[in-house]
Amino acid sequence: MTLFTQTQSNDRIFTVSSLNAEVRLLLENEMGIVWLVGELSNLSMPVSGHWYFTLKDSRAQVKCAMFRGNNRRVTFKPANGTQVLVKARLSLYEPRGDYQLIIESMQPEGDGRLQQQFEQLKMSLAAEGLFAQALKKPLPEQPKRIGIITSKTGAALHDILTVLHRRDPSLPVVIYPTMVQGDGSAISIAQAIGRANARQECDVLIVGRGGGSLEDLWAFNEEIVARTIAASQIPIVSAVGHEVDVTIADFVADMRAPTPSAAAELVSRDITHQTQKIQQKNQQLKNAIRTYLSKREAKTVQLTHRLERQHPQLRLNQQQQHLDDISSRLERAMGRLLSSHHQHVERINYKLSLHSPVQTIKNNQTTLDQRKRRLLDAMDHRLLNANHKLALAAEKLETVSPLATLSRGYSITRDAKGKVIRHIDQVKPGDKLVTKVTDGEIHSTVSE
């Protein structure tokens, strides 16, 4: 009898925790081990050493946990976007009721459609001899001009230009912008290589882009790009992605660089024997470190296996996962607490600013400005009253003015000497007279 086939007469009432516990046991005991392929996403590697991620395909996804006792045996560095093949047990994370997979082993998934196409084209071109060492053209020791074929907005172009400028700022560079990802990108790359060969303005070309998934780099695995590189009269350095990324373009090119920056190093003029010795020592050191780490890792795996055989590891893993969950919530709570303290400090600073000398000066300045405005208003009022009184006095003066008399229709007559004529006996025929009226003067001569 399973959880879902109990009779009505014997119905069982569960708590949430007891239901989750029984579902977990049902999944782990009934399903057993499963194998599946998918793409890694949301990869998290906390300090506990466990890995948490999502495994997905085009239509669905499932949460996964891989505890450190198992992930130490993984021989490659997983990353988001990596296609993997995993061996897993179905389980349930009881505190949240999340259905999940407990991963026991993981390896790269190399049998996918793109990988198969890659291998088929690689074998076909190799059979034609396009990878033959005899076809490789040597790089110029003293290049006069370097051509770069990549995206004009990508990080790879910035990295290449930075290295070239640091090693030889006077070295001319020609950029042939192209698409490096998506539909039509392979044709765009091939056309850029053809354009560089037609112009013959460079004596070495760097063809590449920054890192990405297999799909992102696929343009450099297209046959048209491979054949265009092989037909190039100008030596080509392939610089696609990171050191672990390998494309068909790498096999056909005259030289392969692990990164765009490394390609700039290869074609730069100042590569010296001392630099080569340093690189050799660096590689020897890397190999020694890898050997040491490999031995330590093997020893650690051996001790881990021994510990797993002696302790109830599964229960410990469950508790550790729960601890990771609590730690995450604690970090969020601490963040909220720090935010609250920060706001409290801001409020205190604001209150202090209200009592600071600077604020007092600002307040006094405001009061001074207000009094200044009142004083100016009072002065304007006094001037207005004075102007009004002046206008009244002018009106009174106007009433006794000769001009006022003239404006009422009267006139004033003077002789040639300016003397006012009041009587008729003051003039005789022939005298010149000037009569003043309100809007001017009238000149006349006495006739009789």
UniProtKB/Swiss-Prot annotation:
GO terms for cellular component: cytoplasm; exodeoxyribonuclease VII complex. Keywords: Cytoplasm, Exonuclease, Hydrolase, Nuclease. Its EC number is 3.1.11.6. InterPro entries: Exonuc_VII_L (IPR003753), Exonuc_VII_lsu_C (IPR020579), OB-fold_nuc-bd_dom (IPR025824). It catalyses: Exonucleolytic cleavage in either 5'- to 3'- or 3'- to 5'-direction to yield nucleoside 5'-phosphates. It is an enzyme of class 3 (hydrolase). GO terms for molecular function: exodeoxyribonuclease VII activity; nucleic acid binding. It is found in: Cytoplasm. It holds the Pfam family tRNA_anti_2. It comes from the Bacteria. NCBIfam families: xseA. HAMAP family: Exonuc_7_L. Heterooligomer composed of large and small subunits. Belongs to the XseA family. Bidirectionally degrades single-stranded DNA into large acid-insoluble oligonucleotides, which are then degraded further into small acid-soluble oligonucleotides. This is Exodeoxyribonuclease 7 large subunit. It comes from Photobacterium profundum (strain SS9).
